[in-house]
Amino acid sequence: MPVSISETDIENYAKDGALLIKNLFTPDEVSDLREGIDANISHPSSRAKVASNESDPGWFFEDFCNWQENSAFQRIIFESDISEVAAKLMCSEQVRLFHDHMLVKKTGTKQRTPWHQDQPYYNIEGMQNISFWIPVDPVPLEWTLEFIAGSHQENWYLPRTFLKKEAKWFPEGSLSDTPNIDENPEKYRVLSWELEPGDAVAFHMLTLHAGAGSGALRRVFSVRLIGDDIRHAPRDWETSPEFPGLSDQLPAGVPMDHELFPVIWPASRA
């Protein structure tokens, strides 16, 4: 039975920029996705990156844009309820895939995911967007993501590399620096949830979020989806992920009408 999204859920997503969705995926979908993640780990793409230091006792690994080669990723994106849920939460008539992102933290990983927004790393502008963070392993509170409620309605913050804190995207000083949330936690309403396989967190690409290391294997698949008001915003720098040659095919300010970003809602299911 499809997961139920209430008016309260839609209101909370619009207000907070993050929402826990319990049991979004069936056990069979989770098992299939887990196999897909393991296959991606074994055969990473040229876009894969290690986001932890060599001295880290664990391993923080990520890879991007593999849906065209990974059948399990395709099934989650095109055959699960995720597109319908996205349409409801974004209040969008149409939903396109933006990209997929696999993130793995092995047991004992110390590297934190620092506070950041996702959208400043990207080549898009607009507010109808959503990311789904989908773990295939249990995630207790101490290893989960944290979100600053309502931060998607505020500033764009300067994106930096996770390890060296370099401004490789927007030029230094062109955007505000991310506030020091950990030193002033009382100023913020922080949202976080314990998750089981099958659960997901949906969040806006401008919502500030961060994550701890991990005391156990934590495999996550993220799906980034875009709605009606999203427009192409070519950058003068390499975005993350990069879409080589896209600016030659898709002008600035137009919808993301390109084969890399297929429409997944309304769905055409046989």
Segments predicted by a language model, with ranges:
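Generic beta-strand structural signal
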Residues: E93-V95, H99-D100, Q111-T113, Q128-I134, ...
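Short, charged/polar surface micro-motifs in flexible loops or helix N-caps
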Residues: I82, T107-K110, D137-L141, Q153, ...
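Non-heme Fe(II)-dependent double-stranded beta-helix
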Residues: M1-D16, I21-W115, Y121-Y122, D236-E238
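Non-heme Fe(II)/2-oxoglutarate
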Residues: G36, I41-H43, R47-S55, R160, ...
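Double-stranded beta-helix
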Residues: P140-L208
